[in-house]
């Protein structure tokens, strides 16, 4: 998928087709191009995998500021941020809550899996899901790249902002996943595998709660312990 701003190509995403509009909106938000969906209008399908980012009236973006001479690959998700300092510029203030129990968190990956139709069919898709503080599923999206799945979730959030919510991802909590959660204002991120050292560093500096190895009756809280109840 090629994304353009004012006809200027700014990114090529290697993604699984489906929820394309959510992906474009979420990508624009988590990359700091806009501060939220109110600055966006409907993306325009130009055909042949090319899309124009729709901007609300009065919103001006310099496409050269975000133009990238690289592919965001499905494996690494290099999404235009070269350093933690760059992410901190885009990240806002995270909600102080919610406070959730580790018992609640341990149930969420299984609830997400119940809605992973693509994974059930292929065994090859990652997923991301957004839950409220009570553990109710709000959104689930799938993609070959978990960072794309996160963008699809962010782009589908209604109402905005996400507020006191929990993001769950299949696999590890990478730097890109932590980056996207911080910029979108999602305070808790959980993964079924480990968190990377760079993700933990970013989380510590932004106040993000990162929880890994959420499997069965166990989990590891890396950062933001104050949001997790015993």
Where are the language model's segments positioned?
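Feature captures the catalytic cores and cofactor-binding loops of soluble hydro-lyases/lyases
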Residues: 147-222, 227-230
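Intrinsically disordered, low-complexity regions enriched in acidic/Ser/Thr/Pro/Gln residues
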Residues: 1-128, 132-133, 137-139, 144
